[in-house]
Amino acid sequence: MFSFKGSLLLSFAILLVLSGIQISSAQVRPPVPRASQKATVAQTIGTSEVSITYSRPAVKGRTVYGDWPSDVKGEATLDNQNTRPANAPLVPWGHVWRAGANEATLFTVNDDVLINGQPLAAGKYSFHMIPGKDEWTIIFNKDDGQWGSFSYDASKDALRVKTKPQWASDSEELLSYS
């Protein structure tokens, strides 16, 4: 015959056994890598340290840059509620692009520098681009913590410079800054 004390001990023992079974069945899964892997490129130029941290989107057989329907043109980012039409390029001409994937690309410099002859103060900036067929706008924006270009605000631009694209004869599968 079991006593209350024996019954309590038996219940406790069963609880321990069942807890052990439950704990051992919960397996730790390794984190799944992002589709667009994060990368950082850093360079010392003179005494200035410059780095770009970005996520590397892949082409995956898609058209990267090109024309979009005229009703979604302008300097509104794709991320502002516009849905990419089927078979449309990932980054349309004339739209703000995060210059990577996932979070906005981060540009960091430890000294005041000149970019295309224009001053940029030392600091961290989100790095965006507005691609065009013949000319691109490079944007250094003071909001360095934004996701993509969802909340891009042109009034926070520290610097905008224009540049001419130089197209490579062969393409890379992943975005790469060097």
Positions of the model-derived regions?
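Targeting-peptide/extracellular-domain and disordered-appendage signature
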Residues: 2, 6, 25-121, 126-178
